[in-house]
């Protein structure tokens, strides 16, 4: 990825101060998604390391991970697996509790979403502390997935999430980094 594209990509992400709470800068990718060339290029850059590789499924974390993950699944000719908040999937599910800044939450996946041994890429729009992605990787592994990578458009490196995922043995692909949280 060229430095020019990285700068263009950063410029296409809207910064919303003090959302969802004071002191937080929310990185809104809906502006990037609304720019066809930037969106297409971001997807191309995210999948580039796996071009020609066998990827069986792409798992996207609710909700923006669905948009990016669906586009990546299309690009690599794989299936898509939604990872949702508890109670949102209609069939028998497996769940995983994960840590939030204050407290815990649960995510779920259909018990039959993955055939054991399938190669899976995990996708979300942003990685901060890595709690949700860590929970999603554990959940996918619980149902037999081989998680071969985790992809995020945005990294907030000061919060350590990408390092946490790498420590789990999962390569991480991000496109741009922003300071702060």
UniProtKB/Swiss-Prot annotation:
Pfam family, one: Pribosyltran
Reaction catalyzed: AMP + diphosphate = 5-phospho-alpha-D-ribose 1-diphosphate + adenine
GO annotation terms (biological process): adenine salvage; AMP salvage; purine ribonucleoside salvage
First-level EC class: transferase
EC number from the UniProt entry: 2.4.2.7
Signal peptide residue numbers: none
Molecular-function GO terms, alphabetical: adenine binding; adenine phosphoribosyltransferase activity; AMP binding
UniProt keyword Nuclease, yes or no: no
Subcellular location: Cytoplasm
UniProt keyword annotations, A-Z: Cytoplasm, Glycosyltransferase, Purine salvage, Transferase
Cellular component terms per the entry's GO annotation: cytoplasm
Superkingdom: Bacteria
InterPro entries cross-referenced by the UniProt entry: Ade_phspho_trans, PRibTrfase_dom, PRTase-like, UPRTase/APRTase
Transferase found in the keyword field: yes
Protein's pathway: Purine metabolism; AMP biosynthesis via salvage pathway; AMP from adenine: step 1/1
Quaternary structure annotation from Swiss-Prot or TrEMBL: Homodimer.
Family: Belongs to the purine/pyrimidine phosphoribosyltransferase family.
Function: Catalyzes a salvage reaction resulting in the formation of AMP, that is energically less costly than de novo synthesis.
Protein known as: Adenine phosphoribosyltransferase
Gene name per UniProt: apt
């Amino acid at each position: 990825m060229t430095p020019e594209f990285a700068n263009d990509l950063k410029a296409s992400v809207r910064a919303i101060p003090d959302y969802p709470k004071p002191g937080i800068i929310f990185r809104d990718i809906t502006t990037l998604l609304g720019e066809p060339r930037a969106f297409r290029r971001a997807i191309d850059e995210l999948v580039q390391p796996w071009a020609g590789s066998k990827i069986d499924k792409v798992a996207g974390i609710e909700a923006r991970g669905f948009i990016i993950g669906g586009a990546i699944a299309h690009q690599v000719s794989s299936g898509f697996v939604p990872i949702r908040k508890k109670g949102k999937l209609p069939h028998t599910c497996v769940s995983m509790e994960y840590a939030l800044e204050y407290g815990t939450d649960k995510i779920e996946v259909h018990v039959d979403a993955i055939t054991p041994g399938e190669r899976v890429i995990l996708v979300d729009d942003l990685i901060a502390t890595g709690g949700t992605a860590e929970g999603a990787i554990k959940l996918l592994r619980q149902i037999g997935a081989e998680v071969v990578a985790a992809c995020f458009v945005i990294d907030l490196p000061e919060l350590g999430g990408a390092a946490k995922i790498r420590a789990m043995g999962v390569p991480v692909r991000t496109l741009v980094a922003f300071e702060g949280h």
